[in-house]
Amino acid sequence: MQTSMFLTLTGLVLLFVVCYASESEEKEFPKELLSSIFAADSDFKEEERGCFGYKCDYYKGCCSGYVCSPTWKWCVRPGPGRR
């Protein structure tokens, strides 16, 4: 039982050391990855969403293919039961 506890503890310490070493090597990698994800994400939002969810009212209409929801006052896609 003592041997298995010793091996488990040694394995956890080894895992910690390996993770710490790889993290210190690649400190900039997560920042670069996140910035590239958010940069690509903002590019797709314009094409994908159009003006879905934008605020609208009597004076400011919606993009083509969307209607202003009278209840929520934002742009939605027209569908059955929507006015």
UniProtKB/Swiss-Prot annotation:
Record protein name field: U5-theraphotoxin-Hs1b 2
List UniProt keywords, sorted A-Z: Cleavage on pair of basic residues, Disulfide bond, Knottin, Lectin, Secreted, Signal, Toxin
**What does the similarity note say?**
Belongs to the neurotoxin 10 (Hwtx-1) family. 51 (Hntx-8) subfamily. Hntx-8 sub-subfamily.
Kindly list the GO molecular function terms attached to this UniProt entry. Answer: carbohydrate binding; ion channel inhibitor activity; toxin activity
Note what the entry says on domains: The presence of a 'disulfide through disulfide knot' structurally defines this protein as a knottin.
Renumbered to this chain, the signal peptide range is 1-21
Supply the InterPro entries for this chain.
Huwentoxin-1
- What does the UniProt entry say about where the protein is found? Secreted
Give the SUPFAM superfamilies listed for this entry: omega toxin-like
**UniProt propeptide residues:** 22-49
User: Which body tissues produce this protein?
Assistant: Expressed by the venom gland.
Its cellular-component GO annotations read:
extracellular region
Q: Give the source's domain of life in one word.
A: Eukaryota
Its principal location? secreted
Role played: Agglutinates erythrocytes.
Which Cys-Cys disulfides exist here?
51-63, 56-68, 62-75
